Amino acid sequence: MRNWLVLLCPCVLGAALHLWLRLRSPPPACASGAGPADQLALFPQWKSTHYDVVVGVLSARNNHELRNVIRSTWMRHLLQHPTLSQRVLVKFIIGAHGCEVPVEDREDPYSCKLLNITNPVLNQEIEAFSLSEDTSSGLPEDRVVSVSFRVLYPIVITSLGVFYDANDVGFQRNITVKLYQAEQEEALFIARFSPPSCGVQVNKLWYKPVEQFILPESFEGTIVWESQDLHGLVSRNLHKVTVNDGGGVLRVITAGEGALPHEFLEGVEGVAGGFIYTIQEGDALLHNLHSRPQRLIDHIRNLHEEDALLKEESSIYDDIVFVDVVDTYRNVPAKLLNFYRWTVETTSFNLLLKTDDDCYIDLEAVFNRIVQKNLDGPNFWWGNFRLNWAVDRTGKWQELEYPSPAYPAFACGSGYVISKDIVKWLASNSGRLKTYQGEDVSMGIWMAAIGPKRYQDSLWLCEKTCETGMLSSPQYSPWELTELWKLKERCGDPCRCQAR
């Protein structure tokens, strides 16, 4: 017996030492214990617990109330469940960095790009394009030329114009100039130039007045010049004209050399004339620019306070993964890829469920359906899929990087489930996968490369509605989510209570 004890003692001591070292090992980098400003570091490889499902909840930094509602509804139910509590891991996905540009000073509310207006040209008309003195007046063969632009601060276009040939005596052409709003087939206004009706000559252009509309911030338009004659237009490459942006209130949109032209361009990209515009609301613009320094100071202070609140929230609930991303709408696809990498490198799991913090989720119903339909194989994607979804070229969902008119099939973002091997593929390629305007369409484009088995299920609702048996439903306020869950707990149905 003593001999056996002598042999066993070193084993017992070794096991105890190994366990002690594990307990003292640091938490995963950028997981719940890490501060929101920490960099995403190498993840530890130790994976202590296996989970059937990892749930990733995309959440904005300031959505404290939505996260708390989730913690008090379906997450609380999950943690109190006798079996599911050990089978599911739920994490909120939050960008470690807030945007350092105040919302009022961004080009749009969806990105973190500074609206860089300096020394605006106020109370006078501005020629959008001008030619240098030594520009030659060669005649290209292009009969249709167009250029696109984006308005960054409200302007009014007063005139449309065309270039003329210096060798001509007077105006000897027939040209139509149209201005379109992006993705619209009908022109906002038209100017027609002909020898008997050529307008007014200003510098090297002929101009005609047009009906005046205020073009608002974020307006995207295209000007098209079309020759009605057999010979082409007098036009220039965009690099050979001077763009007068009024101090930064508009931007010409170019495809760039060697790139595919934008879908809404007609003919050849270039300039065959110009337009005259004025800047609107000049006093308001000056006030905005003068108040920027103080606004930035206040905003940075608020960011520090937000960091502290997030760190405290994370330490209390231990359910946040901070990913090394500036937290804006345009960066949501990058947030998701970072979370996939975190999941693979820190967690042992079978399936991953992605949802948003404004969504109702019934995890018990999800598990029941997995068992009923045997939804746990490899190369597997379970959701409610949109097919032939048109690509938007303007607005919040603007997509200029994906050239096709329609996206590949993609699952609605309110909830979908993917198998572990797909998560691993996404994680291993996260540094090379191009991100597009939304995480749902980005996922569809990425998945088109590997062709997973799609399981269509309409119970992952795409729109804000309530259906008995639904697995998810999006776009709810904190109060609405609370009410849905109250009905679910009281009556077994989040949509209604049957009269007894």
UniProtKB/Swiss-Prot annotation:
Its main location: Golgi. The gene is B3GALNT2. Beta-1,3-N-acetylgalactosaminyltransferase that synthesizes a unique carbohydrate structure, GalNAc-beta-1-3GlcNAc, on N- and O-glycans. Has no galactose nor galactosaminyl transferase activity toward any acceptor substrate. The chain crosses the membrane at residues 7-23. Belongs to the glycosyltransferase 31 family. This is UDP-GalNAc:beta-1,3-N-acetylgalactosaminyltransferase 2. N-glycosylated. It comes from Homo sapiens. GO terms for cellular component: endoplasmic reticulum; endoplasmic reticulum membrane; Golgi membrane. It is found in: Golgi apparatus membrane; Endoplasmic reticulum. One of its GO terms (molecular function) is acetylgalactosaminyltransferase activity. InterPro entries: Glyco_trans_31 (IPR002659).
